[in-house]
Amino acid sequence: SDGRNEAANDEASDVIELALKGCCSNPVCHLEHPNACGRRR
C-alpha cells in the first residue's frame, strides 16, 4: 500500500462532507439523510 488510495478516500470524504453540509441546510435533503445531518434540533 503506497498511501495513494487513502489520500483519495480522504479527499472524497471531504467532498461528501461539504455536500452533506449543504444538504443539511436543505429541508428536503435533510429529511432524506437525517443520519448524515446529526438530527440537531
Swiss-Prot record:
Pfam families in the cross-refs: Toxin_8 (PF07365)
GO cellular component: extracellular region; host cell postsynaptic membrane
Region of interest (Ser-Xaa-Pro motif, crucial for potent interaction with nAChR), ranges: 25-27
A GO molecular function held by the record: toxin activity
Compartmental location: Secreted
Known tissue expression: Expressed by the venom duct.
Chief place of localization: secreted
Residues bearing the modification Cysteine amide: C37
Annotated keywords: Acetylcholine receptor inhibiting toxin, Amidation, Disulfide bond, Ion channel impairing toxin, Neurotoxin, Postsynaptic neurotoxin, Secreted, Toxin
InterPro entries: Conotoxin_a-typ
Propeptide residue range(s): 1-21
Origin superkingdom: Eukaryota
Disulphides: C23-C29, C24-C37
Function description: Alpha-conotoxins act on postsynaptic membranes, they bind to the nicotinic acetylcholine receptors (nAChR) and thus inhibit them. This toxin blocks rat neuronal nAChR alpha-3-beta-2/CHRNA3-CHRNB2 (IC(50)=128.9 nM) and alpha-7/CHRNA7 (IC(50)=1511 nM). In vivo, intramuscular injection into zebrafish does not produce any effect on the locomotion of zebrafish.
Note: Negative results: this toxin does not show effect on neuronal nAChR alpha-4-beta-2/CHRNA4-CHRNB2 and on muscular alpha-1-beta-1-gamma-delta (CHRNA1-CHRNB1-CHRNG-CHRND) (when tested at 10 uM).
UniProt note: domains: The cysteine framework is I (CC-C-C). Alpha4/7 pattern.
Family: Belongs to the conotoxin A superfamily.
Stated name of the protein: Alpha-conotoxin CIB
